[in-house]
Curated annotation (Swiss-Prot):
It holds the Pfam family tRNA_edit. Consists of three domains: the N-terminal catalytic domain, the editing domain and the C-terminal anticodon-binding domain. This is Proline--tRNA ligase. The keyword Phosphoprotein does not apply. Keywords: Aminoacyl-tRNA synthetase, ATP-binding, Cytoplasm, Ligase, Nucleotide-binding, Protein biosynthesis. Catalyzes the attachment of proline to tRNA(Pro) in a two-step reaction: proline is first activated by ATP to form Pro-AMP and then transferred to the acceptor end of tRNA(Pro). As ProRS can inadvertently accommodate and process non-cognate amino acids such as alanine and cysteine, to avoid such errors it has two additional distinct editing activities against alanine. One activity is designated as 'pretransfer' editing and involves the tRNA(Pro)-independent hydrolysis of activated Ala-AMP. It comes from Salmonella arizonae (strain ATCC BAA-731 / CDC346-86 / RSK2980).
Length: 572
């Protein structure tokens, strides 16, 4: 490709509304342009990267035995009503009616459509297992699209769905997809972790997320410094303290704390160690409970894990925090003065709280706290559960090493769905025993557009993008200095351009009448891995300058050797 016949569209300045580096660089490198909130046009440079990601995904899906299909973006509402998600899904589901007043949705995912296809096409266990995939546009009406294509409303996704007559068969495909995903992200040159995850709104049993490590990531991922243990922070178990609870050394005392409505204020005003404080959070209880609320207690320096809390049997799902009005109606005190002593609602405490002695907590009286509280002396030990987020330095749940926490960008997610959708849509086949058998499902997704942004978040410097070779828009940039004034520079540039293309190498030759500084800046901004610079001065010695984008190293290569040098560097 020649720049004179190409839409380069680079920008010198960073657009003001671009918050994260991937959004900034995708705009500056001329990869995308915003059409409306959460909607982007992919320009040629961006589309080349997107297609490379898509091709790697497709190759590995095919290698893993998945079968490609293509399903409509527009889906009839009756399928969503049949599955029960018409009511469950929030405003992210874009609903509309056609000219015949028939309701439809723009698909955010395709479980209903593929299950409907399978229930109509398959009839016998002999046809299974099958794993279908597509690379298709999705639409989710995000309330606040942000970070460019990282959290857009329209995006490209690879979604796959497998169907089985046994858990063993599902596990086999799940393991194959886990391995395929690991190959996909390894081939793309990404630093990633596969982590245990919560199944979320899609539902089901086992689940793993594939997270690209990046400072701008929205997720906290947890992994051991010794073993292979890795989990999303929502799921990571906080091990109970191994040391026994210390004996009481203080009497419980009621203290006036009129200006301490938060843990931070309590610690500052009374010079307390934060690990000797407890915070109490009130949430809604399940329907038909004797009490409308449940009290959840975590240590002052810990955070409540809302996913764990929501799974407690007496806590309503979705987790809903009580309002101040609801709290006062039951406790007769405000949120800043709550604690376990004389608490009139059921109490659940975190494992770390159960190991505390001589601690401070609200007295359930406005402006007052108890100091020196001890379990079983001042208040009975309530139900104990793991309800907090782990913190760096906690012991790893597998007993090997301690935990590290890093930020991650979720680029893939695999689920064992079980029979959630097949039961709702009555997708069954005749089993080996001749009886009707409901199918067991797996679900496997990759955010194709998100992968592009995640790769940039991991691969950039002060000059622009530093693409991994496998997904770079071009492999080689040819920069002929003053080619419009030097016949030998132009002649050699054209010769190398043809020879490299004949070797199957993707080349961008900058044949614009631009200053060298502009040419260098543009090629570094868009992140082409290998650059050759052809100039009269080096040609006097039969040399060409080669520069590797990732390291910035430069070297002089003889003109007769440069093609072989590049082929070896790219293809190995």
């Amino acid at each position: 490709m020649r720049t004179s016949q190409y839409l380069l569209s680079t920008l010198k300045e960073t657009p003001a509304d671009a918050e994260v580096i991937s959004h900034q660089l995708m705009l500056r490198a001329g990869m995308i342009r915003k059409l409306a909130s959460g909607l982007y046009t992919w320009l040629p440079t961006g589309l080349r990267v997107l297609k490379k990601v898509e091709n790697i995904v497709r190759e590995e899906m095919n290698n893993a035995g998945a079968i490609e299909v293509s399903m409509p973006v527009v889906q009839p509402a009756d399928l969503w009503q049949e599955s029960g998600r018409w009511e469950q899904y929030g405003p992210e589901l874009l609903r509309f009616v056609d000219r015949g007043e028939r309701p439809f949705v723009l698909g955010p995912t395709h479980e209903e459509v593929i299950t409907d296809l399978v229930r109509n096409e398959l009839s016998s266990y002999k046809q299974l297992p099958l794993n279908f995939f597509q690379i298709q546009t999705k639409f989710r009406d995000e309330v606040r699209p942000r970070f460019g294509v990282m959290r857009s409303r329209e995006f490209l996704m690879k979604d796959a769905y497998s169907f089985h007559t046994s858990q063993e068969s599902l596990q086999e495909t799940y393991d194959a997809m886990y391995a395929a995903y690991s190959r996909i992200f390894s081939r793309m040159g990404l630093d990633f972790r596969a982590v245990q995850a919560d199944t979320g709104s899609i539902g089901g049993n086992a689940s793993h997320e594939f997270q690209v490590l990046a400072q701008s990531g929205e997720d906290d991922i947890v992994f051991s410094d010794v073993s292979d243990y890795a989990a999303n922070i929502e799921l990571a178990e906080a091990i109970a303290p191994q040391t026994p609870r210390a004996a009481a050394t203080q009497e419980m005392t009621l203290i006036d704390t009129p200006n301490a409505k938060t843990i931070a204020e309590l610690v500052e005003q009374f010079n307390l160690p934060i690990e000797k404080t407890v915070k109490t959070l009130l949430v809604k209880a399940v329907k038909d409970s004797k009490s409308p609320l449940v009290a959840l207690l975590v240590r002052g320096d810990h955070e409540l894990n809302e996913v764990k809390a929501e799974k407690l049997p007496n806590v309503a799902s979705p987790l809903t925090f009580a309002t101040e009005e609801e709290i006062r109606a039951v406790i007769n005190a405000g949120p800043g003065s709550l604690g376990p002593v004389n608490m009139p609602v059921p109490v659940i405490i975190d494992r770390s709280v159960a190991a505390m002695s001589d601690f401070a907590a609200g007295a359930n009286i406005d402006g007052k706290h108890y100091f020196g509280i001890n379990w079983d002396r001042d208040v009975a030990t309530p139900i104990v559960a793991d309800i907090r987020n782990v913190v760096a330095g906690d012991p790893s749940p597998d007993g090997q090493g301690t935990l590290l926490i890093k930020r991650g960008i979720e680029v893939g997610h695999i689920f064992q769905l079980g029979t959630k959708y097949s039961e709702a849509l009555k997708a069954s086949v005749q089993g080996e025993d001749g009886r009707n058998q409901i199918l067991t499902m797996g679900c496997y997704g990759i955010g194709v557009t998100r992968v592009v942004a995640a790769a940039i978040e991991q691969n950039f410097d002060e000059r622009g993008i530093v693409w991994p070779d496998a997904i770079a828009p071009f492999q080689v940039a040819i920069l002929p200095m003053n080619m419009h004034k030097s016949f030998r520079v132009q002649e050699l540039a054209e010769k190398l351009y043809s020879e490299l293309r004949a070797q199957g190498i993707e080349v961008l030759m900058d044949d614009r009448k631009e200053r060298p500084g502009v040419m260098f800046a543009d090629m570094e901004l868009i992140g082409i891995p290998h650059t050759i610079v052809i100039g009269d001065r080096n040609l006097d010695n039969d040399d060409i300058e080669y520069k590797y984008r990732r390291s910035g190293e430069k070297s002089l290569i003889k003109t007769g050797d440069i093609v072989d040098y590049l082929v070896k560097a790219i293809k190995g």
